Amino acid sequence: MPTVNQLVRFGRQSVKKKSAAPALQGNPQKRGVCVVVRTTTPKKPNSALRKIARVRLTNGIEVTAYIPGIGHNLQEHSVVLVRGGRVKDLPGVRYKIIRGALDAAGVANRKQARSRYGAKKPKK
């Protein structure tokens, strides 16, 4: 245990918080190019074919990003915007693709939570 004098002289060492999305290097989003677009299965107890893309970011780092929403138009060489945010049942997927930005089209026929999926307001 440190003495009062040691605390005055050196202080306490603060614990550095580890980034949840290190590949973004402190940026809110990063642009990247799709290298592979495929599906994977989630871990137990869930069952589905989750759409994911391997994306090479502008800083040269390659990450696995989740494609949210129903249906997508992404393929190899598509330019996408990537944000942080993990997918709980897909190990190793710590990023998400932003729908409605760059080459990623918004989700069609989306009525609720539209801004999250880049969907325009439906006509009356």
Curated annotation (Swiss-Prot):
Pfam family, one: Ribosom_S12_S23
Keywords: Methylation, Ribonucleoprotein, Ribosomal protein, RNA-binding, rRNA-binding, tRNA-binding
Positions where 3-methylthioaspartic acid occurs in the chain: 89
Any one Gene Ontology BP term: translation
Highest taxon of the lineage: Bacteria
InterPro entries: NA-bd_OB-fold, Ribosomal_uS12, Ribosomal_uS12_bac
GO molecular function terms attached to this record: rRNA binding; structural constituent of ribosome; tRNA binding
GO cellular component labels: small ribosomal subunit
Subunit structure: Part of the 30S ribosomal subunit. Contacts proteins S8 and S17. May interact with IF1 in the 30S initiation complex.
HAMAP family according to UniProt: Ribosomal_uS12_B
PANTHER family on file: 30S RIBOSOMAL PROTEIN S12 FAMILY MEMBER
General function of this protein: With S4 and S5 plays an important role in translational accuracy. Interacts with and stabilizes bases of the 16S rRNA that are involved in tRNA selection in the A site and with the mRNA backbone. Located at the interface of the 30S and 50S subunits, it traverses the body of the 30S subunit contacting proteins on the other side and probably holding the rRNA structure together. The combined cluster of proteins S8, S12 and S17 appears to hold together the shoulder and platform of the 30S subunit.
The family this protein is said to belong to: Belongs to the universal ribosomal protein uS12 family.
Protein name, per record: Small ribosomal subunit protein uS12
Organism field: Caldanaerobacter subterraneus subsp. tengcongensis (strain DSM 15242 / JCM 11007 / NBRC 100824 / MB4)
